[in-house]
Amino acid sequence: MDEQKMPRRPRRDHDGEQPQKSESLVYGKNPVTELLKSGSGVDTVLLAEGMAPAVAAYFTAMAKEAGATVKRVHPNKLRLMTGTESHQGVAAFASEIEYASVEDLLAAAKAKGEPPFLVLSDGIEDPHNLGAVMRSALLCGAHGIVIPKRGGASVTPTVIKSSAGAAEHLPVARVANIGETIRRLKEQGVFVYCADMDGVPLRKNNLTGPIALVLGSEGSGVSQLVKKLCDGVVRLDMAAQGTGVDSFNVSVAAGIILYEIQSQRAGE
């Protein structure tokens, strides 16, 4: 089942001068591996300097898949943070937020007497981009954002900071499968659009009813599977041609599309 989020302010600076043991700090190879696999949310993975390259590569790859930041630290710092010499060169900070369910997001829209307006991340990896998307989503009236448990950024302190305060007010649901979530939303009458370069020009779409906007990853965009599940595809036309600059940054594209949705929903 999906989880609910009501964000809390970050508790600590992971680079602080006086690191201390914390209940949210998990250490040891097996515990950290299981935490990363669980999809329960990881802010940062700390790897000891001097760790075997193959082991470091393993945890770096897992951290990227889980949307976590990787930092290399001196073994003594890990000892201070964990309170033990048996940290095995790896530790991780669990996410500091509580997630909501997709049903909670829909209920929030109903409570306001508004048709649902959701944003879905299909693999946005950069925490700064995710934070910027959250900021635009809040300002444009979205009732929440949905992110994947794996294969994209989770809501870390970097995301919270990049959202410029939006993360304190915008509910976030984290789901195991974006495709299945789209199917469930469609069953409940939500019209699902994705943003892609081969879509219909943005302003030619009716964006006034129950709606969800899917945004793809920075590198490959919306996956083909997700795209096939969507009811419609929108695109942003660009004036510059033949320059080699052929797309908007995902957070910029999100801001433009979300503002158009807000305008149409307001009857403008």
Task: Give the location of each predicted region.
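Short, glycine/polar-rich helix-capping loops at beta-to-alpha or helix-loop-helix junctions
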Residues: V55, G152-T158, S220-L229
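Short, acidic/turn-prone active-site loops that include or flank metal/cofactor-
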Residues: G50-M51, N76, R150-G152, E218-S220, ...
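RNA substrate-binding interface of SAM-dependent RNA methyltransferases
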Residues: K37-G41, A107-V200, K204
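Surface-exposed amphipathic alpha-helices with a cationic face
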Residues: K64, I182-K186, Q262
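Structured adenosyl-cofactor binding patch, chiefly the S-adenosyl-L-methionine
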Residues: T33, I160-A166, K228-E268
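N-terminal positively charged helical leader segments and presequences
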Residues: M1-A108
